From Swiss-Prot:
InterPro entries membership: Fungal_M35_metalloproteases, Lys_MEP, MetalloPept_cat_dom_sf, Peptidase_M35
Predominant location category: secreted
PANTHER family found in the cross-reference section: NEUTRAL PROTEASE 2 HOMOLOG SNOG_02177, PTHR37016
Source superkingdom: Eukaryota
Pfam short name (any one): Peptidase_M35
GO molecular function: metal ion binding; metalloendopeptidase activity
UniProt remark on cofactor binding: Binds 1 zinc ion per subunit.
Signal peptide residues on this chain, from the entry's feature table: 1-16
Source organism: Colletotrichum graminicola (strain M1.001 / M2 / FGSC 10212)
Protein name: Neutral protease 2 homolog MGG_10927
Length: 351
């Protein structure tokens, strides 16, 4: 990992498009996508249940930040997402982070898929969105659980030149030069990176030869293939967290991408190999916590590391925390940032 004082910023569902019909049939949230113009998308969310729902917006298609709102496929292959991957706090949230959708209410948002996906080749694409919303009780800001959702698939034809212009205009707004990571923020970040290395080293050993019960608790498998895959991810993190002057990633201590919205602890832009620690990281988090499944600075660094494509290129699937980890399939756990994070944290905390 390298600290940087300036940079020009850019701001799998392998195979065929896969829409989870079970989620669509059982969720109180109905999500319908519509194509707008060349590469625009309208997401229409309807609460089909009989009670109001208070949805956590951050990191979802309701978020105005450059997060992964949709997945885009061309000829059955997923097009890389070039925006931010977030680490979200599940405590200390404010009302601004939520959207209440009344029973029977419909809520619409619009965005452009070309801003964070390279659609310059043009041609036919399929667009979907699926995952989970965190939610709170209507009179609270404490996360109460998750609600899955899955949209329809929209098939549309893209004009590559128009899409390239949209992308170029969006990225031009994201070009910033920033000097940061000094003083106490640098100290906190350096210490967290060092702790991340120790966490990953212990996790790598546990993945390779540790108890079967821990592997199945977090990854739902303890086969040799699963152990090797997980151990490799942690070994990659050991290497990346082993230096603050070399490696594939760059670390920032100020919000160079403008993505530190409510509840965001840190974020990563995998396409550009940089990570940002938000004010919440410095002002609200302990360096380390021995409470099982707690969030802290050391695990935040590890979480963000897994998002790097050279490490693993994980997703969040819209969910964080132990209960969400337990709800995923084995295949999803292998590509879920918080699964790796909580596996490593459980060893540190002796869970």
């Amino acid at each position: 990992m390298k600290f940087s004082i300036g940079v020009s910023l850019l701001a799998t569902l392998a195979g065929a498009v896969n829409v989870d019909m079970a989620k669509r049939d059982t969720s109180p949230l109905n999500v319908k996508l519509e194509a707008l113009g060349n590469s625009g998308v309208k997401a229409v969310l309807t609460n089909t249940g009989d009670s109001d729902i208070k949805l956590f917006k951050t990191g979802t298609f309701l978020d105005k930040s450059p997060v992964e709102k949709v997945e885009v496929f061309a000829a059955g292959s997923k097009i890389d997402f070039d925006g931010v991957r977030l680490q979200i706090s599940t405590t200390g949230l404010t009302e601004e982070a939520f959207q209440i959708v009344a029973a029977g209410e419909t809520f619409e948002v619009e965005f452009d898929a070309a801003e964070l996906h390279d659609l310059s080749k043009g041609g036919a694409v399929d667009i979907v969105t699926q995952g989970s919303f965190l939610y709170a009780d209507v009179d609270s800001t404490e996360i109460a659980g998750t609600i899955p959702f899955s949209s329809n698939s929209v098939h549309t034809e893209i004009n590559g030149d128009e899409a390239a212009s949209v992308r170029a205009a969006f990225l031009a707004k994201r070009t910033i030069v920033q000097s940061d990571c000094t003083g106490t923020r640098r100290t906190a970040t350096v210490n967290a990176i060092s702790r991340c290395r120790a966490l990953a080293a212990a996790a790598s050993q546990a993945a390779a030869s540790g108890p079967v019960a821990r592997m199945t608790e977090y990854f739902k498998s303890s086969t040799t293939a699963t152990r090797n895959s997980v151990a490799t991810v942690f070994r990659n993190i050991v290497s990346e967290c082993g230096s603050t002057t070399s490696g594939v990633s760059r670390q920032y201590c100020t919000d160079v991408y403008g993505a530190c919205s409510n509840g965001v602890i840190a974020y990563t832009v995998p396409a550009q190999n940089y990570m940002v620690n938000c004010p919440y990281f410095f002002n609200n988090m302990a360096a380390a916590s021995s409470t099982c499944h707690a969030q802290d600075q050391q695990t935040t660094i590890l979480h963000e590391m897994t998002h790097l494509r050279q490490i693993k290129g994980t997703s969040d699937y819209g969910g964080y925390g132990y209960n969400f980890v337990r709800s995923l399939s084995a295949a999803q756990n292998l590509n879920h940032a918080d699964t790796y994070t909580l596996f490593a944290q459980s060893i540190y905390a002796g869970c």
